[in-house]
Amino acid sequence: MKKNFYTISKTMSRSLKLILFSVFIGFSIFLIPQPTWAYPFWAQQKFENPREATGKIVCANCHVASMPTRAEVPQAVAADSVFKTVVEIPYKKDLQEIGADGSKVPLQVGAVVMLPDGFKLAPQERWTDEIKEETQGVYFTQYSEEQENIILVGPLPGDQNREIVFPVLSPDPRKDSNYNFGKYSIHVGGNRGRGQVYPTGEKSNNNLFTATNSGTITSIETNEDGTQIINLNNEEGESFTENLPAGTSLLIKEGDTIEKGAKLTEDPNVGGFGQLDKEIVLQSKARVIGMIIFFIGVGLSQIMLVLKKKQVEKVQAAEGI
């Protein structure tokens, strides 16, 4: 009974936090407009795990464009140690994109690091001075209360954060039998710029738009908010309209005859998402010491064999064999 009550209370607490956070974000959108904001909480609300069975990280569902992401991870780490996972999100300097309101804005970046079970964000009291300096202005969040091993960062200004340092604490299998020494996979995702699709499935203005009908363009209307309406008639005299969001750059003009599927705008996207997998070994000190002793033993055995062989050769030479 107590266990059920605890589970229900925990679920209600998590739901309440999510609702309050969503309300806060909703007010923020109106009070503090940020045209290039990316919201990791959309993924947190829709997916229990940000990595699909196919291996794709769900950020790619909205950030359709692909761009490279790199990561630096130690080959091996000791138990209960702090190490750095560095995510590199490269793009050209001073690059700008169109915001949701159609204006030109700097790119922002974000990253996700999916660690093996037991690995988590290192507590700040264990950060070195170097790590503290490298993570200034960076705010880390875990994907959910139950998933300490999935760490999110962003959105952050891209110009100052093309490299994001994640301080990670490794587990200690000697103290917790749920974890084992061995080789593990780390999944990393990095993004720069806005997505091409909203979580609702609608296309953002960060897209190439094509004609949904054929015909001749009779007029192009521009509204106060920057959105545009393309009016056209086909050969049968039917009228159609193409609605374009703010910030798009037209490739067509009045009087042009276009076919269905023809490009209406330039492709404004300059960003993209990339992901990769890395491997890390959780090393046992006892095993390392054992290996060293083993190799020393093998080396000494080889030396003894060589010395013994030379001794035998000397005896044989003395006896004239």
UniProtKB/Swiss-Prot annotation:
GO MF annotations in UniProt: electron transfer activity; heme binding; iron ion binding
Topology in membrane: Single-pass membrane protein
Any one Gene Ontology cellular component term annotated for this protein: plasma membrane-derived thylakoid membrane
Cofactor binding remark: Binds 1 heme group covalently.
Pfam short name (any one): Apocytochr_F_N
Single GO biological process annotation from the record: photosynthesis
Location within or outside the cell: Cellular thylakoid membrane
UniProt-annotated binding residues for heme: Y39, C59, C62, H63
The entry's keywords: Electron transport, Heme, Iron, Membrane, Metal-binding, Photosynthesis, Signal, Thylakoid, Transmembrane, Transmembrane helix, Transport
Entry keyword Transmembrane: yes
InterPro entries hit by this protein: Cyt-f_TM, Cyt_f, Cyt_f_lg_dom, Cyt_f_lg_dom_sf, Rudment_hybrid_motif
TM region positions: 288-308
Signal peptide: 1-38
Quaternary structure, from the entry: The 4 large subunits of the cytochrome b6-f complex are cytochrome b6, subunit IV (17 kDa polypeptide, PetD), cytochrome f and the Rieske protein, while the 4 small subunits are PetG, PetL, PetM and PetN. The complex functions as a dimer.
Family label: Belongs to the cytochrome f family.
HAMAP family cross-referenced by the UniProt entry: Cytb6_f_cytF (MF_00610)
PANTHER family for this protein: CYTOCHROME F, PTHR33288
Function: Component of the cytochrome b6-f complex, which mediates electron transfer between photosystem II (PSII) and photosystem I (PSI), cyclic electron flow around PSI, and state transitions.
Name of the protein this chain belongs to: Cytochrome f
Provenance organism: Prochlorococcus marinus (strain NATL1A)
Lineage of producing organism: Bacteria, Bacillati, Cyanobacteriota, Cyanophyceae, Synechococcales
